[in-house]
Amino acid sequence: MDEINKNFCYVENFLTKEELEFFSIYAQMYHRSNENSFDEDQTKLGETMQVYGTATETLLLLKTKKINKILETKVLPTYSYWRMYTKFSQLDKHTDRKSCEITASVNLGGCGTKWPLFIDGKEVNIKPGDAVIYHGVEKLHWREEFQG
């Protein structure tokens, strides 16, 4: 917990190879159906996002024990959110809502283009299957425009 109090905690192999493959395929299939890509302003570029999705809520529950062990404290899972970014997408500078005191940003795969997450101005390149854990309500975080 001390590590994320200072900055953030980078976790290699947060997802198993099988979990990564499953969620990568799931996200691509969901994106192709594009069921909700126009429901929110943030998805105006044809992006796909999902809050409280069955697959990601399952992942959230499965990974809570792992996060508890990493942080050496008990956390309470609140919600899951995933987004498939497309060319020219960006993640505006923000902090998370109060219910997301601790954030785990996980790379579910992609096209291989380097696209860092910035946490309080520090560049973090998250590899597929890896995660970065940080205080989302306290740490300003964002991504610049995606060129991939």
What is each PLM-predicted segment?
Residues T16, S80-R83:
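Residue-level "edge-of-site" marker
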Residues Y10-V11, L76-P77, I133-Y134:
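A structural signal for short, well-ordered beta-strand segments and their strand-loop junctions
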Residues L62-K66, Y81, T103:
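Generic beta-strand or strand-like secondary-structure segments
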Residues Y85-E138, W142:
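Catalytic core of non-heme Fe(II) oxygenases with the double-stranded beta-helix
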Residues M1-L71:
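Non-heme Fe(II)/2-oxoglutarate
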Residues E72-Y81:
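A short coil-to-beta-strand element that immediately follows conserved catalytic motifs
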Residues E144-G148:
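Short, compositionally biased
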